[in-house]
């Protein structure tokens, strides 16, 4: 039994048996109540170049978060039932510990693809997405201490002439290694005044562009 170095293979049965499904590095997958695969994965193989974070729930749990687990690179996980039903997971590059999932929503006009948002965490490669795109995964390395805030440069640029930047600021993210929850921190002096942020689940954030100024 094996899996590609850059993938995770989940199984319906314990001990890596039964029907299986593979997911690639950079994917964040969440199942909702009633979905075919919600709470169905019972074991998995993690490729040698990736790690995998798994959650019992995919929502922001209040007041008590569901169960959470970090699965190591190259690991064989024969019994995932301790998670009480897997509803969400992230397949991360092996050198990273956690990730934020981000998207931009255009509230300025009705034309999809009008703006491109770029987020660049400190000493980490940037990710970019356009309004109308789905969430993109932004992996973060292990910090010291692990629940430190990480500052990220945030820009939004028009994708049409004159290609002006309409946002230039920063946002902070903070991770809980106990629950796997990510929180966003907006500092008044640096967070763009023409944007708001909505948390969509335990790692996912929607950045709303409300105006160009």
UniProtKB/Swiss-Prot annotation:
<dbReference type="GO" id="GO:0016339">
    <property type="term" value="P:calcium-dependent cell-cell adhesion via plasma membrane cell adhesion molecules"/>
</dbReference>
<keyword id="KW-0677">Repeat</keyword>
<comment type="function">
    <text>Mediates calcium-dependent cell-cell adhesion during the early stage of development.</text>
</comment>
<dbReference type="Pfam" id="PF14564">
    <property type="entry name" value="Membrane_bind"/>
</dbReference>
<dbReference type="GO" id="GO:0031288">
    <property type="term" value="P:sorocarp morphogenesis"/>
</dbReference>
<dbReference type="InterPro" id="IPR052885">
    <property type="entry name" value="Dictyostelium_CAD"/>
</dbReference>
<dbReference type="GO" id="GO:0030587">
    <property type="term" value="P:sorocarp development"/>
</dbReference>
<dbReference type="GO" id="GO:0005737">
    <property type="term" value="C:cytoplasm"/>
</dbReference>
<dbReference type="InterPro" id="IPR029283">
    <property type="entry name" value="Membrane-bd"/>
</dbReference>
<dbReference type="GO" id="GO:0031012">
    <property type="term" value="C:extracellular matrix"/>
</dbReference>
<dbReference type="GO" id="GO:0005576">
    <property type="term" value="C:extracellular region"/>
</dbReference>
<dbReference type="GO" id="GO:0051702">
    <property type="term" value="P:biological process involved in interaction with symbiont"/>
</dbReference>
<dbReference type="GO" id="GO:0010468">
    <property type="term" value="P:regulation of gene expression"/>
</dbReference>
<dbReference type="Pfam" id="PF08964">
    <property type="entry name" value="Crystall_3"/>
</dbReference>
<dbReference type="GO" id="GO:1904643">
    <property type="term" value="P:response to curcumin"/>
</dbReference>
<dbReference type="GO" id="GO:0042802">
    <property type="term" value="F:identical protein binding"/>
</dbReference>
<dbReference type="GO" id="GO:0001726">
    <property type="term" value="C:ruffle"/>
</dbReference>
<dbReference type="GO" id="GO:0005938">
    <property type="term" value="C:cell cortex"/>
</dbReference>
<dbReference type="InterPro" id="IPR015059">
    <property type="entry name" value="Ca_cell_adhesion_N_dom"/>
</dbReference>
<dbReference type="GO" id="GO:0045335">
    <property type="term" value="C:phagocytic vesicle"/>
</dbReference>
<feature type="region of interest" description="4 X approximate tandem repeats">
    <location>
        <begin position="1"/>
        <end position="194"/>
    </location>
</feature>
<feature type="repeat" description="2">
    <location>
        <begin position="49"/>
        <end position="97"/>
    </location>
</feature>
<keyword id="KW-0130">Cell adhesion</keyword>
<dbReference type="GO" id="GO:0030139">
    <property type="term" value="C:endocytic vesicle"/>
</dbReference>
<dbReference type="InterPro" id="IPR038423">
    <property type="entry name" value="CAD_C_sf"/>
</dbReference>
<dbReference type="GO" id="GO:0005811">
    <property type="term" value="C:lipid droplet"/>
</dbReference>
<dbReference type="GO" id="GO:0031152">
    <property type="term" value="P:aggregation involved in sorocarp development"/>
</dbReference>
<dbReference type="GO" id="GO:0050829">
    <property type="term" value="P:defense response to Gram-negative bacterium"/>
</dbReference>
<feature type="repeat" description="4">
    <location>
        <begin position="147"/>
        <end position="194"/>
    </location>
</feature>
<dbReference type="GO" id="GO:0071944">
    <property type="term" value="C:cell periphery"/>
</dbReference>
<dbReference type="GO" id="GO:0005509">
    <property type="term" value="F:calcium ion binding"/>
</dbReference>
<dbReference type="GO" id="GO:0009897">
    <property type="term" value="C:external side of plasma membrane"/>
</dbReference>
<keyword id="KW-1003">Cell membrane</keyword>
<dbReference type="InterPro" id="IPR011024">
    <property type="entry name" value="G_crystallin-like"/>
</dbReference>
<dbReference type="GO" id="GO:0005911">
    <property type="term" value="C:cell-cell junction"/>
</dbReference>
<dbReference type="GO" id="GO:0005516">
    <property type="term" value="F:calmodulin binding"/>
</dbReference>
<dbReference type="GO" id="GO:0007157">
    <property type="term" value="P:heterophilic cell-cell adhesion via plasma membrane cell adhesion molecules"/>
</dbReference>
<dbReference type="GO" id="GO:0000331">
    <property type="term" value="C:contractile vacuole"/>
</dbReference>
<dbReference type="GO" id="GO:0030027">
    <property type="term" value="C:lamellipodium"/>
</dbReference>
<keyword id="KW-0472">Membrane</keyword>
<dbReference type="GO" id="GO:0030175">
    <property type="term" value="C:filopodium"/>
</dbReference>
<keyword id="KW-0106">Calcium</keyword>
